[in-house]
């Protein structure tokens, strides 16, 4: 008789995680990024992998130690093998999970979100800062050298829609759509629409046709084809959503909301209901691996 044993990743600092399993969460805040298996528990014991900037600080210029003090985006990319990280204290990087190697870095003032585009490009949304308030485009092979820049007040969200070949960008009060030029070295603004409410905060992809948009006092579903917003009923009475992820097929909702100021110690989920409490980190965003 053969017995099959399935072992879920449960790592210590000395072990490697080559790829984040589907259904796991990535959370970030302060100078740290965590990978969480929500099926383990609802406290810090659910953390199966963690990274602090100082672990990789010697790989890039020393000044970056000042720029990764408040991480505010931790997006899984490259088939969940890497994490795209931004920090409001002034930088963006691409981190390989297995060896914690920084593969791209750039000074991005008050960066709040980033995403990958075809052609090894990365787009970054920068929020309110004398050198920020912008959308920037970089090549992964050329750290610190933006190849395109557009003004964007209080940039907070960036999402690439691969089916439509469009980049969606969230600012303070508008949602923009860009196309990548044929030469893949610039972006063209296609259209702009006002969002319901002010203080655009998070932008995430539901599917090829819909986006989730959070602002200070509301969360809405944006229909790309119809170009209209509808209230997101599950969070209709919840304010100050900092990050929101919704799987429409399973109805699984995972989000963070400001509770202590702009941060929280909790990650919330529904279907089933769950609250993961991590008291040692000022959590800002959570992302889900699909």
Which ranges hold each PLM region?
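Repeated scaffold domains used in trafficking and secretory/extracellular systems
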Residues: 61-75, 107-117, 152-160, 196-206, ...
């Amino acid at each position: 008789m053969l017995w099959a044993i399935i072992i879920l990743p449960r790592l210590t600092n000395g072990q490697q995680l080559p790829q984040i399993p589907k259904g796991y969460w990535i959370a970030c805040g302060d100078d740290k990024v965590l990978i969480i298996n929500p099926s383990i528990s609802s406290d810090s014991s659910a953390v199966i992998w963690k990274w602090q900037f100082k672990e990789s600080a010697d790989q890039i210029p020393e000044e970056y130690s000042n720029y990764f003090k408040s991480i505010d985006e931790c997006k899984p990319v490259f088939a969940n093998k890497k994490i795209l990280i931004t920090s409001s204290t002034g930088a963006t990087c691409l981190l390989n999970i297995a060896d914690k190697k920084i593969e791209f870095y750039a000074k991005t003032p008050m960066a709040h979100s980033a995403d990958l585009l075809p052609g090894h490009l990365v787009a970054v949304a920068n929020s309110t800062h004398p050198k920020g308030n912008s959308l920037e485009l970089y090549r992964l092979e050329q750290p610190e050298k933006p190849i395109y820049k557009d003004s964007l007040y209080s940039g907070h969200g960036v999402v690439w829609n691969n089916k439509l070949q469009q980049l969606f960008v969230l600012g303070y009060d508008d949602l923009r759509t860009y196309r990548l030029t044929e030469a893949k070295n610039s972006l063209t603004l296609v259209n702009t629409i006002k969002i319901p409410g002010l203080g655009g905060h998070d932008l995430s992809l539901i599917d090829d046709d819909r986006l989730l948009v959070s602002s200070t006092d509301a969360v809405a579903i944006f229909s790309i084809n119809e170009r209209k917003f509808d209230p997101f009923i599950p969070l209709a009475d919840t304010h100050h959503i900092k990050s929101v992820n919704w799987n429409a097929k399973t109805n699984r909702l995972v989000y963070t909301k400001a509770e202590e100021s702009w941060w929280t110690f909790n990650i919330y989920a529904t279907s089933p209901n769950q609250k993961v409490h991590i008291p040692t980190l000022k959590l800002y965003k959570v992302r889900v691996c699909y």
